[in-house]
Amino acid sequence: MVRTALLVRTMMRLLAMVFRMDILAGRSADEGSQEGTLARAACMYAETYDTHKVPYHQCYCTYFHGHTSHINTQMYEKHSKMKEICSTFVNHASYFAGHNIINGLKSIIMKEFVKMTLATLAGLLIFGIVAFFFSFAMIGAMAALGEKQVVMPREAVLKIDMSSFTLSEQSVEANPMDAILAGGSTITPIGIYDAINAINAAAADPAVKFIYMKPDGASGGTAQIEEFRKALSNFRKSGKAIVSYTESPGNASYYLASVSDKIFMTPHDGATNMFTGLSSQLIFIKDLLDKLGVNVQLIRHGKYKSAGEMFIRNSSSKENMEQNVEMVESLWNTWASEIAQSRGITTEQLNGMLNNLELNFPTDWVENGLVDELLNYNQLEQKLCDLFVAEKFEDVKGISLTDYATLKNTVNFKAKKKVAVIYATGDIVDGDAKDNVAGNRFAKIISDVRKDSTVQAVVLRVNSPGGSVLASEKIKAELDLLREYKPVIASYGDYAASGGYWISANCDKIYSNASTLTGSIGVFSMIPDVGGAVKDKLHVTITPVNSNEHGDMYGLMRPLTPKEVDYMQASVENIYDKFTRLVSEGRGMPVERVDEIAQGRVWTGADALTIGLVDEIGTLEDAINYAALSIDGVSGVQDVQVVGYPKPQTTVEALLESITGESNVFAGTAFEGIGEAFGEFGKHDIGKAYARMPYVITVR
């Protein structure tokens, strides 16, 4: 950086000097003859050459009419380079005649300039090379720190600490930067399919004696939690036990713990009971926008299409409240029925405990049959010793789920045939972005999968609330083409709504979790009018100048005219008609029936099964198994390679993202939902049509 600045300064000074000498060369003979010009030029150069800016020398030039000149060198001997240059001027005065003075000076200057430039560039090049290799060495060292050698004991307990990882759609490599910043402890994302495979492997592994689970702090989507619990339930069928220990149970954590053979709880008071039932919070910010002088104009089709409602109302519409109540009740019925069945009680009894707040103290949990025994940690260790058949707790060897998954989730490279799993996770957006479901990028991925002859079946894993209609159309077009060559099976995660349903409605078979949120077959467009805020709050007046009558239609400085509203409404209606027709074709039902269950309404997977929007309640594992069996000559998933697209981040990519990534300043605060609400403005291009489910839905 210092060398670069020095180079720039030197170039500027040399250019300025040459410019001044050009002027000097054009003076009249009265002001400077050939010899006089030489002396003056040499003097100028001496004065300019002091790169150290230290006035330790002076050069006095005297002009003699007798065609002689000399340089009075007073104190300049201290500067050897200047002495050399000035001597050159005096000894070769005949050469520097007229304009040749300038050429000679330029030649000398350029030699010095070139030498300095080359030296500087060489230094920069060497520095760049060293920095490049040093950076990669550091990244490699940090990546190595993030890796550890996993060793499987001869006999072990599979330890599942739900607070140490989060269930995600795809596994990603551990980011060592996170570990460094967090002081050595991080929450690792583990893909749901990898987690399920690990549990399945443990069921058949004679080295794994039982599962010890700490369910508190469980994180993941509702569908991911549901799939994980099903895998635990299947583990029990192997005859091996699951024991859980909880201190502060919540909805998701107790839902997981309830599958256990035994549930132990701390006897100590003071822990907060978060097991109170599910809740969906709807946020409305119209009053806030009114105070800011912002008016949002919403054009939509579907009485249940509540996306954007938060901007135009201060409370929920009747239809939106209806669908949210039914959605939360359906989700809770799924969880409550499984909890009740596992604990040998009725759902009515369970709901009564929660409604009457009967689970206040640890003893209440035992009395109501939700916990088997209260144990302090020493007593818990003895229980684990008894199950492991060990004399002391130090002999109870364990391996974490994430480490065990690393050992067991290996690719079957011997298999020549592949099942591709395309993970459509996040908002559906236009362009080629690496995050979310970018239309151009995913169309390219699907096209590549179609052209890969080793891929003989495809699972489309959808975990998206929808988004851009244009991007959805691009993705669906490629999927339709893919279906002409290979079977495409859909698997729904937490969301497969609106645009998420658009891209998957024509799949050969659709699996959905009971807690999946799907449907939301509707369309909307949204235009904010910020003219009032600009004029009244910022005191800025904007006057449009248009070539045509509606040139400023999307200028945001005025409300739409009735004619413009009709124009946009016609576009929304046209897209809605296309949406219902493609659902009719994909699901084999009349358009009129599709319209009845559409209207933008959100359905849970359990309800979607009854109305024909999905084919079967099942997990990602079920969809992959079905896809494998659809391949000729394949008897099961063990005979194929399962490959995921897009490829997950590498350690290096995760490190770079850590350095350049963004953070949510509202995360974990009461304002997080409001921050997300304002963030919705940035997700929509003005005037575009979107197929997206209602915005901020938080289920706890």
Feature locations, PLM:
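Short, Lys/Arg-enriched N-terminal segments with co-localized hydrophobic residues
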Residues: 72-109
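Intrinsic disorder and flexible/low-complexity segments
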Residues: 414-419, 423-454, 645-700
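Cleft-lining beta-strand/loop regions that shape enzyme active-site pockets
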Residues: 149-151, 156-283, 411-533
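N-terminal type II signal-anchor transmembrane helix
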Residues: 111-151, 155
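Charged, glycine-interspersed solvent-exposed loop segments at helix/strand-loop junctions
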Residues: 286-385, 531-611, 615-631, 635-637
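Extracytoplasmic and endomembrane cell-envelope/extracellular-matrix remodeling and assembly machinery
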Residues: 380-421, 475
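Polybasic, low-complexity intrinsically disordered segments
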Residues: 3-9, 13-65
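Short hydrophobic helices that act as membrane-entry/anchoring signals
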Residues: 103, 107, 111-126, 672, ...
